[in-house]
């Protein structure tokens, strides 16, 4: 099963992305699941470090009130998941 991670600082957008992806996974019967939705990049990094396997990452480009943006988060994810799929959302 392919894990999906979502990092988005806007709670409403995060919920909408999660709902949309869950619906598409169910409709299409994909072998995937939402592993973590978070508004904080450090939570995503910790989860990926704890379970470093190939995943799909939806990363907000501009993370307000955080020390890193989506591109910096992608660089950190690459340290643990070099073959993962990074999708930048703006």
Model-derived features with residue positions:
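Short amphipathic alpha-helix used as the core "switch/output" element in two-component signaling
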Residues: 68-83
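Active-site residues of response regulator receiver
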Residues: 58-62
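Extreme N-terminal starter segment of soluble prokaryotic enzymes
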Residues: 1-4
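Amphipathic alpha1 helix at the N-terminus of the CheY-like receiver
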Residues: 12-26
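The feature encodes the CheY-like receiver
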Residues: 64-66
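A short, hydrophobic beta-strand element within the central beta-sheet of small alpha/beta folds
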Residues: 83-90
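Acidic, metal-coordinating helix/loop segments flanking the phosphotransfer/catalytic sites
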Residues: 15-19, 32-56
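Conserved acidic carboxylate
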Residues: 8
């Amino acid at each position: 099963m392919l894990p999906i991670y979502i990092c988005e600082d806007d709670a409403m957008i995060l919920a909408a992305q999660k709902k949309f992806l869950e619906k598409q996974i169910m409709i299409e019967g994909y072998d995937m699941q939402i592993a973590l939705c978070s508004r904080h990049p450090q939570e995503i990094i910790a989860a990926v470090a704890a379970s470093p396997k190939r995943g799909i990452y939806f990363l907000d480009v501009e993370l307000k009130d955080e020390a890193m943006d989506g591109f910096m988060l992608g660089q950190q994810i690459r340290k643990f998941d070099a073959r993962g799929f990074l999708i930048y959302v703006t």
